[in-house]
Amino acid sequence: MKVARASLRNFKRFQNLDLDFRNRATGDVASPFLIIGDNGTGKTTVLQAVALCLSMAAATTRSVRQFDWLGWVPGRFERWGRPVIELEVHFTGDEIEATRQAALRWFRSRDGEGQDQPFVEPADSPVVTVRMDGEHFEAGTREQLYQLRGRSYAAQLLRTDHTARELFDRLPGVFWFDQFRNLASPPNEEGADENGQGRVGFQVGVARLRQHLNRWQMAKIGGRWGPRDFLQELENLYRTVFNGRSFGLPEPMYRGGVPTPDDYYFMLNDGNRTYDIEEMSAGEQSVFPLLYEAVRLQFRHSIVLLDEVDLNLHPPLAQALVHALPRIGPECQFFLTTHSGAVASIISPEQTYRLPGGRLCL
């Protein structure tokens, strides 16, 4: 799934903005696509528009109030009039087929619940226009709208059928990482509830992540791993960006009693000494949530929005991250923002859009 065009009306600072996300030389839908501009010109706003519209259509965000992006203020959504967001979304044949298979498996799994209603098969349209008008959205037909809900079908199926995890590799979705991300950033599919409870304090967030990683680590050590080694996949991605670093063995916290995954540090190795994830550098903390979620949620064929891609990264590391994106999310379309000349220099000008305003610096 890729977005070729976007149109924003009365959305935050933009009264009227049209964007084309295709490579201006080849005409192909671009990835990565870089948005640059001075502070306050609306880079984050563009990413929010894409994430909000797609996640509402995909039923992963239930309302404007639930949209989880730090700095998003739902009470001002219609401050400048009724917002309209329109996206032109492209699908491959395999994505369409995978979504149809997931929808059918979900329908058949309901044990009679709702079986009196006919099965509505997602459409097979290679191009779908998704339109969000206020909080109402549409996609031509109901069947076309369901083309965006493959991961939602699979997530519901996964509650009762663990084999549904194999579906995610082929299903498109939308994921975003804001400019305030760190180890406490909430899991993508959970987000915040109606009262904004998706975010937690740093210590709680780190403890939650450490527990999840240690469960993977101990399952691997105990030989209880399934057909896919998620921990090894995560370490491989981590080493791709942070050359010379690796994962170490769990280190006990010595709290006494029978240890649980909460009672171990998750260790990393810099080639000289070891350290716990809580001791990560700011640059590592900005990248690790992307790597972890990419493995855990199996990013494929999806839209991934990464605000301030160079966040807390030395220029060579920022470039290493950009170069690693196709490996982090195969067949994904990445939307990036940056203030870094090092990042802008390695992305084609034909795949870069500069928002107007301010002084030209990139």
What are these regions (language model features)?
Residues 307-309:
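Walker B catalytic acidic pair
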Residues 1-55, 326:
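Pre-Walker A-like glycine/lysine-rich segment at the N-terminus of P-loop NTPase domains
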Residues 2, 181-280, 285, 292-302, ...:
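Extended helical coiled-coil dimerization/tether regions that scaffold
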